[in-house]
Amino acid sequence: MEAVETSTGTSSANADLYILGAGVSFPEHLSIETIEILGHCGMICTNLQEKHLSLFPPDLRLKCKSLWGLYLDGRPRSENYLDVVEEVLRITETTRPTAWLTPGHPLIFDSVSAALLSRGRAKGWSVCVLPAISCLDTILGDVEYDPARGLFVYEATGLVRRNVGIPPNTPVLLLQPSVFNIDHALLSVNTEGPNLSPLRDYLLNFYDRSHRCAFVRSASRLSGPAQIVWREIGDISSLPYRDIAGSTLFIPNA
């Protein structure tokens, strides 16, 4: 495979640690380059569940280690992430190159990948990040919107906590509404879910109560067909968790 120079000067053919994305729908969103690098690695660490790894061909499956068991329901998410980071670093100390494979794009709202990037380089390792299909890509297709006309993207909790103004004449994507104001892990769709009343009240500073928005979850082999749940902004706090789990909130322009 021909080496490709990244903006950091790290060749994609000789890294110690690869930070890779599995895309939104695994395994069909894996790029050819990602598959080639996985074949080159001595170990593949991932937060995909063990039952999903059977979708890999046998030669890659044998090198996979699922770290899903380190994510504990109800525990602070930051503690779960730290345990995963430490385990990937421990494995990379003895097996190189190692790959970290995570759903979506590896650096879009992924605390584990961000920590591995900084801590790996602090150790003097060559760390390479490869892009992948993210929910931003798939959701724009789901709602059939061309961002050339403008798009505001923010994480839902951060938007409210930082009191960020919203331009109502520009469509908005708010990521991770399913964990709004929640710092602990929610691993079951049967959970009570977040209280979206503060998010609703914040959005009402910029939109009418009747302005319609959609909770969008893109199709994937693991989660099923795409789901788009339209509601008026004034009603978003009444939705059951199953309607918002794993979704992104799309708000068209007013």
Residue ranges, per PLM feature:
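Class I S-adenosyl-L-methionine
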Residues: 2-28, 32-130, 236, 247-248
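Beta-strand/loop-alpha-helix module characteristic of Rossmann-like adenine-cofactor folds
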Residues: 2-20, 43, 93, 126-254
